[in-house]
């Protein structure tokens, strides 16, 4: 029951991850490597949402996009690490409840 509830709670986060991933695969290659920061803004947004959730990660990503403009100095700008990892990431980047080994 708890695992099902966790999946429901994580659904909006995973929906945002799917949208950002789709953008990275379809739209981002059209523009090429134009971001002044490393990782790129879309990679930063993806990691921020994976790491911090939809609201806090979305705010971090929006702030990053606002800072990325032609006159920005750029450089390395990693997503702030979370103190405690609550969830794990799948191979496709979605966030799921941690699996606990049973025996």
Swiss-Prot record:
Signal peptide: none annotated. It comes from the Bacteria. It holds the Pfam family YidD. This is Putative membrane protein insertion efficiency factor. Could be involved in insertion of integral membrane proteins into the membrane. Its main location: membrane. Keywords: Cell membrane, Membrane. Belongs to the UPF0161 family. It is found in: Cell membrane. One of its GO terms (cellular component) is plasma membrane. It is a peripheral membrane protein. PANTHER family: MEMBRANE PROTEIN INSERTION EFFICIENCY FACTOR-RELATED.
